[in-house]
Regions:
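Short, glycine/charge-rich beta-strand/loop segments that flank catalytic centers
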Residues: 106-116, 126-143
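Helix-start/capping segments and mature chain N-termini
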Residues: 1-117, 145-353
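Short, charge-rich binding segments
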Residues: 123-128, 148-150
Length: 353
Protein backbone atom coordinates (compact mmCIF):
# COMPACT_ATOMS: atom_id res chain seq x y z
CA UNK A 1 0.00 0.00 0.00
CA UNK A 2 1.28 3.46 -0.87
CA UNK A 3 1.24 5.86 2.08
CA UNK A 4 1.82 9.50 1.22
CA UNK A 5 3.89 11.21 3.91
CA UNK A 6 3.89 14.99 4.33
CA UNK A 7 6.20 16.10 7.14
CA UNK A 8 5.37 19.15 9.24
CA UNK A 9 7.45 22.30 8.83
CA UNK A 10 6.61 23.45 12.36
CA UNK A 11 7.61 20.85 14.93
CA UNK A 12 6.11 21.24 18.38
CA UNK A 13 8.09 21.57 21.59
CA UNK A 14 7.82 18.28 23.45
CA UNK A 15 6.42 18.56 26.99
CA UNK A 16 8.35 17.67 30.14
CA UNK A 17 7.59 14.17 31.40
CA UNK A 18 6.40 15.55 34.75
CA UNK A 19 3.61 17.51 33.04
CA UNK A 20 2.25 14.79 30.75
CA UNK A 21 -0.87 13.52 32.50
CA UNK A 22 -3.15 11.75 30.05
CA UNK A 23 -4.23 12.94 26.59
CA UNK A 24 -3.24 16.60 26.96
CA UNK A 25 -0.50 16.82 24.31
CA UNK A 26 -0.39 15.56 20.73
CA UNK A 27 2.42 14.68 18.36
CA UNK A 28 3.34 16.43 15.11
CA UNK A 29 1.44 14.23 12.67
CA UNK A 30 -1.65 12.10 12.19
CA UNK A 31 -2.40 9.18 9.90
CA UNK A 32 -5.54 8.97 7.77
CA UNK A 33 -7.19 6.78 5.16
CA UNK A 34 -10.53 7.41 3.47
CA UNK A 35 -13.31 4.96 2.61
CA UNK A 36 -16.28 5.21 0.28
CA UNK A 37 -18.74 2.60 -0.91
CA UNK A 38 -17.57 3.34 -4.45
CA UNK A 39 -13.78 3.34 -4.02
CA UNK A 40 -13.25 1.29 -0.86
CA UNK A 41 -10.21 2.23 1.24
CA UNK A 42 -7.96 4.76 -0.50
CA UNK A 43 -5.80 7.86 -0.03
CA UNK A 44 -3.61 6.61 2.82
CA UNK A 45 -1.53 9.46 4.20
CA UNK A 46 0.45 10.78 7.14
CA UNK A 47 0.09 14.54 7.42
CA UNK A 48 0.76 17.33 9.92
CA UNK A 49 -1.59 17.27 12.91
CA UNK A 50 -4.48 19.64 12.28
CA UNK A 51 -8.19 20.12 12.90
CA UNK A 52 -10.61 17.95 10.94
CA UNK A 53 -13.13 19.68 8.71
CA UNK A 54 -16.48 17.89 8.38
CA UNK A 55 -19.94 18.78 7.08
CA UNK A 56 -22.48 19.92 9.72
CA UNK A 57 -24.71 17.00 8.70
CA UNK A 58 -21.89 14.44 9.02
CA UNK A 59 -23.23 11.12 10.25
CA UNK A 60 -20.93 11.02 13.26
CA UNK A 61 -22.33 14.27 14.67
CA UNK A 62 -25.96 13.14 14.64
CA UNK A 63 -26.07 9.37 14.97
CA UNK A 64 -22.89 8.42 16.82
CA UNK A 65 -21.32 6.46 13.96
CA UNK A 66 -17.92 6.30 15.62
CA UNK A 67 -15.53 3.70 17.03
CA UNK A 68 -12.04 3.91 18.45
CA UNK A 69 -9.12 1.97 19.84
CA UNK A 70 -6.38 2.60 22.36
CA UNK A 71 -2.87 1.15 22.44
CA UNK A 72 0.61 2.32 23.33
CA UNK A 73 4.14 2.52 22.01
CA UNK A 74 6.90 2.16 24.60
CA UNK A 75 10.53 3.26 24.77
CA UNK A 76 12.70 0.25 25.60
CA UNK A 77 15.74 0.52 27.84
CA UNK A 78 17.94 0.07 24.73
CA UNK A 79 16.32 3.16 23.17
CA UNK A 80 14.13 1.34 20.66
CA UNK A 81 10.35 1.62 20.41
CA UNK A 82 7.80 -1.18 20.49
CA UNK A 83 4.04 -1.70 20.61
CA UNK A 84 2.09 -4.17 22.73
CA UNK A 85 -0.19 -6.62 20.86
CA UNK A 86 -1.19 -4.14 18.13
CA UNK A 87 -2.87 -6.72 15.91
CA UNK A 88 -5.38 -7.45 18.68
CA UNK A 89 -6.46 -3.81 18.51
CA UNK A 90 -6.90 -4.06 14.76
CA UNK A 91 -9.08 -7.14 15.16
CA UNK A 92 -11.21 -5.49 17.85
CA UNK A 93 -11.58 -2.36 15.73
CA UNK A 94 -13.17 -4.45 13.00
CA UNK A 95 -15.52 -6.17 15.45
CA UNK A 96 -16.65 -2.73 16.59
CA UNK A 97 -17.02 -1.59 12.98
CA UNK A 98 -19.28 -4.53 12.16
CA UNK A 99 -21.53 -3.73 15.13
CA UNK A 100 -22.00 -0.10 14.08
CA UNK A 101 -22.27 -0.79 10.33
CA UNK A 102 -19.02 1.02 9.64
CA UNK A 103 -16.63 -0.40 7.02
CA UNK A 104 -14.15 -2.99 8.23
CA UNK A 105 -10.57 -2.29 7.23
CA UNK A 106 -8.23 -5.04 5.98
CA UNK A 107 -5.96 -5.99 8.86
CA UNK A 108 -2.79 -5.58 6.81
CA UNK A 109 -3.86 -2.09 5.69
CA UNK A 110 -4.63 -0.89 9.22
CA UNK A 111 -1.47 -2.49 10.61
CA UNK A 112 0.80 -0.99 7.94
CA UNK A 113 -0.64 2.49 8.44
CA UNK A 114 -0.30 2.16 12.22
CA UNK A 115 3.29 0.93 12.18
CA UNK A 116 4.40 3.53 9.62
CA UNK A 117 2.78 6.25 11.73
CA UNK A 118 4.62 5.11 14.87
CA UNK A 119 7.85 4.97 12.87
CA UNK A 120 7.34 8.60 11.82
CA UNK A 121 6.36 9.73 15.34
CA UNK A 122 8.70 7.55 17.41
CA UNK A 123 10.69 10.54 18.71
CA UNK A 124 7.50 11.46 20.62
CA UNK A 125 7.76 8.27 22.69
CA UNK A 126 8.95 9.42 26.13
CA UNK A 127 11.61 7.46 28.01
CA UNK A 128 10.77 8.21 31.66
CA UNK A 129 9.46 5.38 33.80
CA UNK A 130 5.68 5.06 33.59
CA UNK A 131 5.39 7.05 30.37
CA UNK A 132 4.45 5.95 26.85
CA UNK A 133 3.07 7.17 23.54
CA UNK A 134 -0.68 6.59 23.58
CA UNK A 135 -2.08 5.78 20.14
CA UNK A 136 -5.71 6.55 19.36
CA UNK A 137 -7.02 5.04 16.11
CA UNK A 138 -10.62 5.99 15.39
CA UNK A 139 -13.15 5.70 12.60
CA UNK A 140 -16.26 7.73 11.91
CA UNK A 141 -19.08 7.83 9.40
CA UNK A 142 -18.90 10.95 7.26
CA UNK A 143 -21.95 11.05 4.99
CA UNK A 144 -23.02 14.63 4.29
CA UNK A 145 -26.71 13.95 4.73
CA UNK A 146 -29.23 13.45 7.51
CA UNK A 147 -31.04 10.16 8.06
CA UNK A 148 -30.24 6.95 9.93
CA UNK A 149 -28.53 4.47 7.62
CA UNK A 150 -25.33 2.48 7.16
CA UNK A 151 -22.67 4.88 5.98
CA UNK A 152 -21.33 5.34 2.46
CA UNK A 153 -18.31 7.41 3.49
CA UNK A 154 -15.91 7.07 6.41
CA UNK A 155 -12.54 8.23 7.70
CA UNK A 156 -10.00 6.22 9.69
CA UNK A 157 -7.58 8.40 11.65
CA UNK A 158 -4.71 7.74 14.07
CA UNK A 159 -3.39 10.37 16.48
CA UNK A 160 -0.74 10.07 19.19
CA UNK A 161 -0.30 11.57 22.65
CA UNK A 162 2.68 11.22 25.01
CA UNK A 163 1.23 10.22 28.38
CA UNK A 164 2.02 9.52 32.01
CA UNK A 165 -0.36 7.86 34.47
CA UNK A 166 -4.06 7.67 33.60
CA UNK A 167 -5.17 8.12 37.21
CA UNK A 168 -3.57 10.76 39.44
CA UNK A 169 -3.02 7.98 42.00
CA UNK A 170 -0.77 6.13 39.51
CA UNK A 171 -0.26 2.54 40.72
CA UNK A 172 -1.59 3.44 44.18
CA UNK A 173 -4.97 1.90 45.10
CA UNK A 174 -8.08 3.80 44.03
CA UNK A 175 -11.49 4.11 45.66
CA UNK A 176 -14.45 2.77 43.65
CA UNK A 177 -18.19 3.34 44.10
CA UNK A 178 -20.51 0.48 43.12
CA UNK A 179 -23.18 1.93 40.82
CA UNK A 180 -26.75 0.68 41.22
CA UNK A 181 -28.69 3.30 39.26
CA UNK A 182 -27.20 3.85 35.81
CA UNK A 183 -25.96 0.97 33.62
CA UNK A 184 -23.11 0.93 31.14
CA UNK A 185 -24.53 -1.50 28.58
CA UNK A 186 -26.95 -4.37 28.02
CA UNK A 187 -26.57 -7.66 26.22
CA UNK A 188 -27.55 -7.23 22.58
CA UNK A 189 -26.40 -3.61 22.64
CA UNK A 190 -22.99 -2.13 21.94
CA UNK A 191 -21.22 -3.05 25.19
CA UNK A 192 -18.66 -5.27 23.47
CA UNK A 193 -17.86 -2.58 20.88
CA UNK A 194 -15.46 0.26 21.60
CA UNK A 195 -17.69 3.14 20.58
CA UNK A 196 -18.03 6.63 21.95
CA UNK A 197 -21.67 6.28 22.95
CA UNK A 198 -20.81 3.71 25.63
CA UNK A 199 -18.45 6.18 27.26
CA UNK A 200 -20.75 9.20 26.94
CA UNK A 201 -23.52 7.26 28.69
CA UNK A 202 -21.19 6.38 31.56
CA UNK A 203 -20.11 9.92 32.42
CA UNK A 204 -23.09 10.78 34.65
CA UNK A 205 -22.36 7.94 37.05
CA UNK A 206 -18.66 8.72 36.89
CA UNK A 207 -19.36 12.34 37.81
CA UNK A 208 -21.49 11.27 40.79
CA UNK A 209 -18.66 9.05 42.01
CA UNK A 210 -16.11 11.81 41.53
CA UNK A 211 -18.25 14.26 43.50
CA UNK A 212 -18.22 11.79 46.40
CA UNK A 213 -14.45 11.39 46.31
CA UNK A 214 -14.25 8.16 44.28
CA UNK A 215 -12.13 7.58 41.19
CA UNK A 216 -14.68 5.55 39.24
CA UNK A 217 -17.71 3.27 39.41
CA UNK A 218 -18.11 -0.50 39.41
CA UNK A 219 -20.84 -1.37 36.92
CA UNK A 220 -23.59 -3.95 37.44
CA UNK A 221 -25.43 -5.66 34.58
CA UNK A 222 -28.25 -3.78 32.89
CA UNK A 223 -30.98 -6.42 33.29
CA UNK A 224 -30.93 -7.80 36.82
CA UNK A 225 -28.66 -5.11 38.32
CA UNK A 226 -27.00 -8.01 40.07
CA UNK A 227 -23.89 -9.15 38.23
CA UNK A 228 -20.59 -7.27 38.10
CA UNK A 229 -19.40 -6.17 34.66
CA UNK A 230 -16.67 -3.51 34.43
CA UNK A 231 -15.00 -0.85 36.54
CA UNK A 232 -15.03 2.59 34.93
CA UNK A 233 -13.63 2.07 31.43
CA UNK A 234 -11.70 -1.06 32.42
CA UNK A 235 -12.24 -4.75 32.92
CA UNK A 236 -12.16 -5.87 36.54
CA UNK A 237 -10.72 -8.83 38.44
CA UNK A 238 -11.04 -10.07 42.02
CA UNK A 239 -8.85 -12.49 43.95
CA UNK A 240 -11.20 -14.53 46.14
CA UNK A 241 -9.92 -17.46 48.19
CA UNK A 242 -6.77 -17.70 46.11
CA UNK A 243 -8.56 -17.73 42.73
CA UNK A 244 -8.82 -14.80 40.35
CA UNK A 245 -12.42 -14.24 39.27
CA UNK A 246 -13.38 -11.97 36.37
CA UNK A 247 -16.78 -11.43 34.73
CA UNK A 248 -17.20 -13.59 31.66
CA UNK A 249 -17.62 -11.92 28.28
CA UNK A 250 -21.35 -11.91 27.72
CA UNK A 251 -21.86 -9.34 24.97
CA UNK A 252 -22.14 -6.33 27.27
CA UNK A 253 -18.49 -6.31 28.36
CA UNK A 254 -15.59 -5.02 26.27
CA UNK A 255 -13.13 -7.84 25.48
CA UNK A 256 -10.07 -6.08 26.83
CA UNK A 257 -6.62 -6.83 25.47
CA UNK A 258 -5.08 -6.19 28.89
CA UNK A 259 -7.74 -8.49 30.38
CA UNK A 260 -6.75 -11.23 27.94
CA UNK A 261 -3.07 -10.67 28.71
CA UNK A 262 -3.68 -10.81 32.48
CA UNK A 263 -5.45 -14.14 32.13
CA UNK A 264 -2.57 -15.58 30.11
CA UNK A 265 0.02 -14.34 32.62
CA UNK A 266 -1.96 -15.66 35.59
CA UNK A 267 -2.33 -19.10 34.04
CA UNK A 268 1.39 -19.18 33.18
CA UNK A 269 2.10 -18.57 36.89
CA UNK A 270 -0.18 -21.42 37.94
CA UNK A 271 -2.88 -19.14 39.35
CA UNK A 272 -6.41 -20.39 38.75
CA UNK A 273 -8.67 -18.03 36.80
CA UNK A 274 -12.45 -18.24 36.64
CA UNK A 275 -14.35 -16.37 33.92
CA UNK A 276 -17.94 -16.47 35.16
CA UNK A 277 -20.89 -14.56 36.52
CA UNK A 278 -20.02 -12.79 39.76
CA UNK A 279 -22.92 -11.30 41.69
CA UNK A 280 -22.75 -8.26 43.92
CA UNK A 281 -24.04 -10.46 46.76
CA UNK A 282 -21.12 -12.86 46.34
CA UNK A 283 -18.69 -9.95 46.29
CA UNK A 284 -20.25 -8.40 49.41
CA UNK A 285 -20.03 -11.75 51.20
CA UNK A 286 -16.37 -12.04 50.22
CA UNK A 287 -15.67 -8.53 51.49
CA UNK A 288 -17.47 -9.13 54.78
CA UNK A 289 -15.85 -12.52 55.38
CA UNK A 290 -12.37 -11.37 54.43
CA UNK A 291 -12.02 -13.83 51.54
CA UNK A 292 -11.71 -10.97 49.03
CA UNK A 293 -7.94 -10.71 48.93
CA UNK A 294 -7.40 -8.30 46.05
CA UNK A 295 -9.31 -6.32 43.43
CA UNK A 296 -8.05 -4.39 40.42
CA UNK A 297 -9.04 -2.90 37.10
CA UNK A 298 -7.09 -3.62 33.94
CA UNK A 299 -6.95 -1.70 30.68
CA UNK A 300 -4.60 -0.09 28.18
CA UNK A 301 -4.64 3.39 29.70
CA UNK A 302 -3.88 2.48 33.33
CA UNK A 303 -2.53 -1.08 32.68
CA UNK A 304 -3.35 -2.28 36.23
CA UNK A 305 -5.25 -0.14 38.73
CA UNK A 306 -5.44 -1.60 42.27
CA UNK A 307 -8.71 -1.09 44.14
CA UNK A 308 -8.24 -0.15 47.80
CA UNK A 309 -11.85 0.54 48.72
CA UNK A 310 -15.32 -0.33 47.44
CA UNK A 311 -18.42 1.59 48.51
CA UNK A 312 -21.92 0.16 48.15
CA UNK A 313 -25.13 1.73 49.43
CA UNK A 314 -23.16 4.09 51.61
CA UNK A 315 -21.06 1.36 53.26
CA UNK A 316 -17.29 1.43 52.72
CA UNK A 317 -15.39 -1.84 52.36
CA UNK A 318 -11.57 -1.73 52.45
CA UNK A 319 -9.79 -4.16 50.12
CA UNK A 320 -6.51 -5.64 51.36
CA UNK A 321 -6.29 -2.82 53.93
CA UNK A 322 -6.00 -0.34 51.07
CA UNK A 323 -2.70 -1.87 49.94
CA UNK A 324 -1.54 -3.25 46.59
CA UNK A 325 -1.94 -7.03 46.56
CA UNK A 326 0.82 -9.47 45.64
CA UNK A 327 -0.96 -10.75 42.51
CA UNK A 328 -1.88 -7.22 41.43
CA UNK A 329 1.74 -6.09 41.76
CA UNK A 330 2.98 -9.17 39.90
CA UNK A 331 0.67 -8.48 36.96
CA UNK A 332 1.67 -4.83 36.84
CA UNK A 333 5.38 -5.67 36.98
CA UNK A 334 5.07 -8.42 34.36
CA UNK A 335 2.97 -6.48 31.85
CA UNK A 336 4.85 -3.19 32.15
CA UNK A 337 8.13 -5.09 32.16
CA UNK A 338 7.25 -6.70 28.82
CA UNK A 339 5.91 -3.42 27.44
CA UNK A 340 9.05 -1.44 28.29
CA UNK A 341 11.40 -4.26 27.35
CA UNK A 342 12.62 -4.89 30.91
CA UNK A 343 11.18 -8.42 31.08
CA UNK A 344 11.61 -11.11 28.45
CA UNK A 345 8.54 -11.40 26.23
CA UNK A 346 7.98 -15.15 26.34
CA UNK A 347 4.46 -14.69 24.93
CA UNK A 348 5.45 -13.04 21.64
CA UNK A 349 3.33 -9.95 22.31
CA UNK A 350 5.56 -7.01 21.38
CA UNK A 351 6.10 -5.57 17.90
CA UNK A 352 9.36 -3.66 17.51
CA UNK A 353 9.46 -0.58 15.29
Amino acid sequence: MEIKIVKTQNKKVKPEASTLGFGKYFSDHMAMITWSSEKGWHKARIVPFENLSIHPASTVLHYGAEIFEGLKAYRRKDGGVQMFRPMENVKRLNRSAERLCLPTIPEDVAFELLTKFVEVEQEWTPSNEGTSLYLRPFMFGNDETLGVHSVHNAEFVIIASPVGSYYKEGINPVKIMIENEDVRAVRGGTGYAKCGGNYAASTRAGKRAEDKGYSQVLWLDGVERKYIEEVGAMNVMFKINGKVVTPMLSGSILPGITRMSCIEVLKSKGIEVEERLLSIDELLDAMKSGTLEEAFGCGTAAVISPIGELMYDGVKYPVNNGQIGETTQMLYDTLTGIQWGKVEDTFGWVYKI
